[in-house]
């Protein structure tokens, strides 16, 4: 009924249609600054649900993606695929008011990846400003993705002056 009253207000979900400034491409290979340029004081919020692939389950192309983003980090071969988004996010928000948050595998917050990923993010002045405790996530898809995730929000520590939150 809304569609009848307000033309083009409600679109069918599928098939996907071009809308706004959605860019289709490999996020780890694209230049985020070119796609979404921002100034120091602009409020920009990146958020997403990047793919969850452990280091042992990545294809050769995905391993190359991680190397292109994290290749200067000692031990980058042990990183989950999603770690690339955290590193690119840290570069993107550096010295600005921009922030990012991702639904992520909980493995980047525990175990061997912590010593590889988080020191690099802290060197880039990134700091966790909110986090949700790990929880099981599934979906209704045919091949239901049963995974334990957490949600982590990050800001540049020089530009963030608010309270930090941990949600249980």
Language model features with spans:
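Signature of N6-adenine DNA methyltransferases within the class I
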Residues: 1-12, 16-19, 27-34, 38-168
């Amino acid at each position: 009924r809304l569609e009848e009253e307000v033309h083009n207000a409600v679109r069918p979900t599928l098939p996907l249609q071009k809308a706004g400034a959605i860019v289709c491409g490999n996020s780890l290979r694209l230049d985020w600054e070119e796609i979404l340029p921002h100034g120091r004081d602009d409020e920009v919020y990146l958020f997403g649900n990047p793919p969850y692939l452990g280091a042992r389950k990545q294809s050769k192309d995905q391993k190359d993606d991680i190397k292109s983003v994290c290749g200067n980090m000692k031990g980058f071969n042990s990183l989950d695929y999603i770690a690339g988004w955290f590193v690119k996010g840290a570069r993107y928000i550096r010295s600005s008011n921009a922030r990012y948050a991702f639904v992520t595998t909980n493995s980047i917050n525990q175990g061997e990846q912590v010593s590889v990923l988080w020191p690099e993010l802290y060197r880039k002045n990134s700091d966790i400003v909110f986090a949700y405790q790990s929880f099981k996530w599934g979906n209704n898809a045919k091949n239901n993705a049963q995974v334990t995730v957490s949600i982590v929000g990050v800001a540049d520590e020089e530009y963030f002056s608010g309270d930090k939150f941990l949600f249980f």
